Amino acid sequence: MLKFVILVCSVACVFGAVVPGGMLPQLDGRIVGGFEADIEDFPWQVSIQRGGYHFCGGSIYSPEIIVTAAHCLEKIDASQLRVRVGGSYWDEEGSLLTVSNFKIHEKYDAMIMWYDVALLKLSSKLTYGATVKNIELAKETPPDNADAVVSGWGTIYENYPYMPVQLRSVDVKIVSREVCRSDEYGYGNAIGPTMICAYAVGKDACQGDSGGPLVVGEALVGVVSWGEGCAYPGFPGVYTDVSVVRSWITENAKSF
C-alpha cells in the first residue's frame, strides 16, 4: 500500500507532485532502519523548513546554493522557506537562514518525476566550518552495488506519528537504472534516464527526506526523490542521478 503520512501542515501545503504509478514523493521525513547521526559527519546536510517545521532535506553546493528536489518546491514561495545549516537537530543548533530565490529544473515533470532537482539561493552566504561544508557533485553514475549513505530527519517507523528532531543516516547499496527497472524489482519502466536507485533490506529514505543527499565516498550522487512505501521489499528508494543533472546545477548556480 502506498504511504503518505501528513505530519504537519507545512507538509500538506507543499505536496503537489504525482509520481509514476501513483507512487508518492518522500515528503514527511523519515530514515528507516538507520541510526542517529552528527552533523559533523554530514556537514553538507540542511533542513528545509516551512511554518517552523522541517519538510525536506538538501545539500550545500556553495556558500549561497542548496541542491534539493523540485517536488519540494511546488506551489510555494521563497519567502515562506527557511534553511537550517550546521545543526544535528532540525529545530535547534546551527543557523536558520532565509531564502531569496529558487529555481526548478525546466524539464521537471511531476507526472513521471524526471529531472526532480532544484536550487535554493540563500539570502546570505555561509561560512564553512566543521558543521557547515559543501559537497562535490558526482561526475558519473556510481556502479551497481556501490556502498552509499542517505541522511535526513524524520520518523523511524512507517506510520510512526512523531518526527524525531535528530539527524539520522542509513547505509544502502546503489542499484543501477538497468537493474532497478528489471524484473528483480517492482518499478519497471517508471525508472527514467534521470534516476538512480538505492536499496537495503529494511532500510530506506522515505517521505520528508525528499531533496536530501545520497552520497558515495565524498560525492553527492543522488537527490532523494520518490518511492513505494518505506523500505518495502523489492522497491528501492529512487533518487535523481546527480551526474545527469550536474551541468544544469553548475550552470544555474552561477546565473541566479
From Swiss-Prot:
Belongs to the peptidase S1 family. Its main location: secreted. Coiled coil: none annotated. It holds the Pfam family Trypsin. The record marks 204 as: Required for specificity. Residues 1-22 form the signal peptide. GO terms for biological process: proteolysis. The active site is at 71 (charge relay system), 116 (charge relay system), 210 (charge relay system). The lineage of its organism: Eukaryota, Metazoa, Ecdysozoa, Arthropoda, Hexapoda. It is found in: Secreted. One of its GO terms (cellular component) is extracellular region. GO terms for molecular function: serine-type endopeptidase activity. Disulfide bonds join 56-72, 180-197, 206-230. Protease that shows preferential cleavage after Arg and Lys residues. This is Hypodermin-B.
